[in-house]
Curated annotation (Swiss-Prot):
Substrate binds at N74, H80, D87, I101, S102, R111. One of its GO terms (biological process) is chorismate biosynthetic process. Its EC number is 4.2.1.10. One of its GO terms (molecular function) is 3-dehydroquinate dehydratase activity. Homododecamer. The active site is at Y23, H100. This is 3-dehydroquinate dehydratase. Keywords: Amino-acid biosynthesis, Aromatic amino acid biosynthesis, Lyase. It catalyses: 3-dehydroquinate = 3-dehydroshikimate + H2O. InterPro entries: DHquinase_II, DHquinase_II_CS, DHquinase_II_sf. The lineage of its organism: Bacteria, Bacillati, Bacillota, Bacilli, Bacillales. Pfam families: DHquinase_II (PF01220). PANTHER family: CATABOLIC 3-DEHYDROQUINASE (PTHR21272:SF3).
Length: 146
């Protein structure tokens, strides 16, 4: 069975209470449970990780290469300035799909640039929690060689 990793970055543990007008009322626990269920229907095992700390995210990305076949990553605000996370993604051979709940290109100007997207297999933004499922579908296609 394929194993995939879902990584959520800073402040995503506050889903459901933080800026519900932007991120919705769903919680991280709900998102993770829904994603695990969706992955299971595809015959895939999905493990979830969340951290507010850049180093912890870098560590899990490094470790992932030997354990998982791909990563779905929401780097949160690190998207816009973490060259260290960008370098961690670039240093591994498994595909990474970047996902964002909101459309970062329609928000404040400082959110428009993603320093991590260029080293990811793709980026999905603006579809709420459904974007994570789209990322899962895209990652599975990437792993099939599509």
């Amino acid at each position: 069975m394929k194993k995939l990793l879902l990584v959520n970055g800073p402040n995503l543990n506050r889903l459901g209470v933080r800026e519900v007008n932007v991120y919705g009322k769903g919680t991280l626990a709900t998102l993770e449970a829904d994603m695990k269920q969706e992955a299971e229907t595809m015959g895939v095992e999905l493990e979830c990780f969340q951290s507010n700390h850049e180093g912890a995210i870098i560590d899990i990305i490094h470790e992932a290469e030997d354990i998982y076949e791909g990563i779905i990553l929401n780097p949160g605000a690190f998207t816009h300035y973490s060259y260290a996370i960008r370098d961690a993604i670039a240093s591994i051979s498994i595909p990474v799909i970047e996902v964002h709940i909101s459309n970062i290109h329609q928000r404040e100007s400082f959110r428009h640039e993603s320093v991590t997207a260029a080293v990811c297999a793709g980026q999905i933004v603006g579809f709420g929690f459904y974007g994570y499922k789209l990322a899962l579908f895209a990652l599975m296609e990437k792993l099939r060689g599509a």
